[in-house]
Amino acid sequence: MSLKHQKQSYQPLPTAAAMDNPAMIQSSGSSGSSSSEEGGSREDVANLSPLGLPTTYSSQQLMPSDTDSMEEERHRLRPHHHHHHPLGEHHHIPGIPPSAVVPSRLSSVGRSQWFTVTVLCFVNLINYMDRFTIAGVLTDVRNDFDIGNDSAGLLQTVFVISYMVCAPIFGYLGDRYSRPWIMAVGVGLWSTTTLLGSFMKQFGWFIAFRALVGIGEASYSTIAPTIISDLFVHDMRSKMLALFYFAIPVGSGLGYIVGSKTAHLANDWRWALRVTPILGIVAVFLILLIKDPVRGHSEGSHNLEATTYKQDIKALVRNRSFMLSTAGFTCVAFVAGALAWWGPSFIYLGMKMQPGNENIVQDDVAFNFGVITMLAGLLGVPLGSFLSQYLVKRYPTADPVICAFGLLVSAPLLTGACLLVNSNSVGTYALIFFGQLALNLNWAIVADILLYVVVPTRRSTAEAFQILISHALGDAGSPYLVGAISEAIMKHLHKNPSDSGLTTELRSMSQVAGSAISNATQVIAEATTSLMETARSSASQEYSDVEQFEGLQYALFSTSFVEVLGGIFFIFTACFIIKDKYNATRGLQDATAQQQQRDERGQIA
């Protein structure tokens, strides 16, 4: 059965896939074809795999419902990237208001869309600036509150715990209510609590306000990517997501720089926390000016009804690509959290041990680390997006493979930096730069994977679920885990100075490996209980610079083991990505067909 013989209500809506595939426009728009052309199509379809869907697209495409038309549509949706869209730069999707135009290139993106993306990127930037401002002044915070490495790591951990616990709540709300209002309330909350926290004189109150900051930030991070997914499709979506995720490394780097320099100028680390709240208030008003696009708008679907939360969770758990990519992303979060929190302090201790660097200033180290982090993000995030767009045209499983490659390359580079930091500053910075660059290949790609293996009405929930898992087993525990391990090692070295050397190194690395594996398999609590107990009694104990350096060095080796584990998760993701993408396409088709039936019955009534 051909497409033209189907009932009008089940006719597939021409989607933005046609922008890159003129054959699809021509075949669906023509009244017939020659017998030779039909024969060629059938031959091509016969050679097409059962999962022959347009894997280069990060959107779900609507397809006919009967078997013959399904096979024809699979053939038509095969990419022909050397053609230009015959209808010009925009393609209007029937069934959507005329204003709903899907841009095919950067020059055709409308002002409203640019404004929305710019605001979301700005808020994401100050989000990560705020998150890592304390890392740039961590030594001053420790000295002011008289706390050890374990308590210093706990500052980030309580923030991330509240962040991940509230993410599912905002994910549920984001799939059902006004997203700009939810984000505005959240940004206002974290701006207010950050400002109030800077005035707290007791560590207990200070850490409580850091936890409240996490609640506010969860509202934004869960929802913002889904708005971008409803505005763009295909390569354009990947480009905009790459732009959005620039903010993670760039904002983190600015957090180190702004935090350290503001504290230096004001001669008080508390002023470092009073910069982002001002920007946050501006962001609240900008967020209220953006329009909330219809969910599924860019994929030719509109007014789709959300399913129950139980159904959403059940579908996500059964989605193997989503679960495995989330596990891989958890490893990315673990490494990024540990490196971002402890990197400046560790590099400072290591370089201070080099001859002639005894008077090195930590503010300068934090500044250099921030610049390197920003440069690695400016290059790594778009490089990952570019590799994805280029390779996925030929290799449908390229996205998870690129992520695995980034983690497996980053692991030895960061290990080398840990070993070289007390002897070669230039080499250390170079290894950290390339290690972070490889790690940053993941950010935009993982977000894109989620968006094309999950149907539009579940995306905010999926974002929240991914945030919950990745932070619960990733950067929620990594700063505290690294701090607790370093405290335990420092205590041992302080009691047994003669153990500092190769024997201690091998033993400590073995302990770190075991702790990293325990974290990945959800047994981290049991593995670190003894470390927490031994570290608690030594918070106020004085350690030498060598002991502090070696404690952090051995603890940070855990990140390399976790990166290898993450690479394995992404390799497994590649085994299921095509099938799960196809399932998401069919799910969107079924939901759209059901909605069309309901609309028709309503019109008849």
UniProtKB/Swiss-Prot annotation:
Region (Disordered), start-end ranges: 1-94
Transmembrane segments: 115-137, 153-173, 180-200, 203-223, 240-260, 271-291, 329-349, 367-387, 401-421, 431-451, 465-485, 558-578
Tissue specificity statement from the Swiss-Prot or TrEMBL entry: Enriched in brain (at protein level).
Comp. bias regions, Polar residues: 55-67
Lineage of the organism: Eukaryota, Metazoa, Ecdysozoa, Arthropoda, Hexapoda
Protein's recorded name: Protein spinster
Similarity section: Belongs to the major facilitator superfamily. Spinster (TC 2.A.1.49) family.
Reported phenotype of the disruption mutant: In most cases, death at the late pupal stage, probably due to lipid accumulation in endosomes/lysosomes. Some flies survive until adulthood and display a strong rejection behavior of female flies in response to male courtship accompanied by decreases in the viability, adult life span, and oviposition rate of the flies. Some oocytes and adult neural cells undergo degeneration, which is preceded by reductions in programmed cell death of nurse cells in ovaries and of neurons in the pupal nervous system, respectively. The central nervous system (CNS) of flies accumulates lipopigments.
